Amino acid sequence: MPAELTYEATSRELATDRGVLRYHEAGSGPPLLMLHGSGPGVTGWRNFRGNLARFAEHFRCLVLEFPGFGVSDPTDDHPMMAAGGAVGRFLNGLGLDQVDVVGNSMGGIIGAQFAIRRPERVRRLVTVGGIGPNIFSPNGSEGIRLLMEFTDDPSRERLIRWLRAMVHDQRLVTEELIEERWEQATDPDTLASARRMYGSKAMAARAKAMAQSDEPPYWAMLHKLKARTLITWGRDDRVSPVDMALVPMRTIPDAQLNVFPNCGHWVMIEQKAAWESAVLAFLTRKDEQ
């Protein structure tokens, strides 16, 4: 990694009325907001550090760390709620009127919801897995079940099982990755936040609330998304199976779908070069007149 793209060299802070938001910044050009996913030990840096060098050649890359994941200030809110509010505060704090957004899994959902609420602020949206309803596995995927098991009762063995479900190429689950994720995932504030999202009690309460609610699920609102959208997916994703892509592909008015073979949930890591090429082609394509 170039010296100018290290963790320390790219780290930034932004004070807001809801605490400090931390982020990484690299490159110059049009702003590209990069939103991380969820899960044990996740951070924006770990999701996108391998992609920064190439994207920073074209964009001012802004990798936001959501509250509740151990980097930005902690929150007592549900992580999804905290993340949604953080995006608006972050862009306002930096004085950015419009951005392109790349969102991994949960980050893609947050990006889509923000683009629906504030269509003038998102030019183009890229999602990585995670967005849409489970069609063939309505009771939750293997990866989500493993995530719940770890969150309820953390152990290195459960973490390793979950990590192995994240990738097609098992060689990516290295001791370095395990140790890095374990240290972050077992931080008390981070674990408490994870339990509000993925603990079995929280998941059961959420399912009950959704069944009783008159509000439509987020994916039923995707037809309101005006931003041109690229949906990217790993064919062998065991966390958010590729059948989930069918609804957003059909309902987002201006959407295209790229599916990458021999690839699990972390498309931007496991199919790095192909994914970067597809995303850059999409983001730099001239707007149609």
Task: Name these PLM-found stretches.
Residues 103, 107, 111:
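Gly/Ala-rich beta-loop-alpha elbow adjacent to hydrolase catalytic centers
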Residues 53, 63-102, 277-280:
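Active-site loop/oxyanion-hole signature of alpha/beta-hydrolase fold enzymes
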Residues 225, 231-233:
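Short beta-strand/loop motif that positions the catalytic acidic residue
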